[in-house]
A protein has these predicted regions:
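Bacterial Sec-dependent signal peptides at the C-terminal "C-region" and cleavage site
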Residues: 19-25
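N-terminal glycine-rich anion-binding loops that anchor highly charged ligand groups
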Residues: 55
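Positively charged n-region of N-terminal signal peptides that target proteins for export
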Residues: 1-7, 145
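Bacterial N-terminal signal peptides
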Residues: 8-19
Length: 319
């Protein structure tokens, strides 16, 4: 038991050190940054290295092909309370469509509340908020029992307060994914995200004379991942390439390890999306095919290292 704990800690530290050298790029200035922060407690606890995973109600968000490999229906809900009045929430459901397909739907929201508004003289005039939403519809089809192809259709919205008006941008994008199950222990995954996604801003609704239509492109993200399952733990690793207009903006390595203490308790840690997380999952209710799991992760990122630890809580159920 002690040797297994040492191995778990050693791998966690190794993932942190290796990933730190490859995660120096900053893509926060590009649209959709809230989608690149991780969603549930399990996701951030594993460094968001879920390209080759097929486990939960938000499987399609990371790789739509994973929905075809789920044996049960899964639901997931999570919430992150971040520093600087930021928040991130998600809800998702994935359903198996017999005999060889799967479908999922998810909603992700990220926003900032209680922003101080000031007039041209610098005087306080109230508080405002801004937020982004993503609605994701996933579908996947499995072939020959080992290979699945999947597709996401996504609608993203972004609302910005300007004076007494609300400026809204809307984007429609597509994700394409592949998942290959080599055997019961090894899975490979690949996904291309944000194809054709770009916010369209119509400022002429606020500035009648000087307004225009402006497009803000999402970065296209290429991911490849592997998941390896052992007797009582599994290792997940992703490599990620972020591009914009065919130009490589940078690359990142995300990874995590998940250790099963028993059938009810799981420990995990990982580094990815410039966030280091460690946490656990506890299945506190089981009845036939129905089960409920509570997940928790403590996360540190580039912002939180000056403002304490982010606590991420999520719950998932299978039925």
């Amino acid at each position: 038991m002690k040797n297994k704990i040492y191995m778990y800690l050693f791998f966690s530290i190794g993932i942190f050190l290796v990933s730190s050298t490859l995660n120096g790029q900053d893509f926060a200035r590009f649209p959709g940054s809230f989608l690149r922060m991780g969603t549930t407690a399990r996701a951030v606890g594993l460094g968001s290295a879920l390209t080759a995973d097929s486990h939960h109600g938000l499987t399609g968000v990371y790789n739509p092909a994973g929905t075809a490999f789920l044996e049960k229906r899964h639901g997931t809900a999570g919430h992150q309370i971040l520093s600087l009045d930021r928040q991130l929430s998600c809800v998702g459901v994935t359903i198996k469509l017999p005999p060889t397909a799967g479908i999922g739907i998810a909603w992700i929201h990220g926003g900032v509340n209680r922003i101080e508004e000031r007039n041209s003289q610098g005087e306080y005039s109230g508080r405002i908020s801004t937020g982004e939403n993503a609605f994701v519809l996933s579908f996947a089809q499995k072939f020959s029992g080992r290979v699945a192809f999947g597709l996401n259709a996504k609608i993203m919205t972004h609302t910005l307060p300007i004076y007494d008006e609300k400026l809204s941008g809307t984007a429609v994008g597509v994700d394409v994914g592949l998942l290959y199950k080599l055997n019961n222990f090894v899975q490979f995954g690949g996904v291309v995200q944000n194809l054709n996604a770009k916010y369209q801003w119509k400022t002429n609704t606020i500035f009648e004379e000087t307004g225009t239509i402006y497009y803000d492109n999402f970065p296209v993200i290429y991911r490849a991942g592997i998941k390896t399952r052992f007797v009582n733990f599994q290792v997940l690793c992703d490599v990620e390439f972020v591009t914009n207009d065919s130009m490589l903006l940078g690359k990142r390595l995300n990874g995590g390890i998940e250790y099963y203490l028993n059938e009810n308790i799981t420990f995990r840690s990982g580094f990815g999306e410039k966030r280091f997380g460690i946490g656990f999952g506890y299945t506190y209710f089981k009845l036939d095919n129905f089960g409920v799991t509570m997940d928790y992760s403590a996360v540190v990122d580039e912002v939180q290292k000056f403002n304490g630890i982010t606590h991420v809580i999520s719950s998932s159920f299978s039925f």
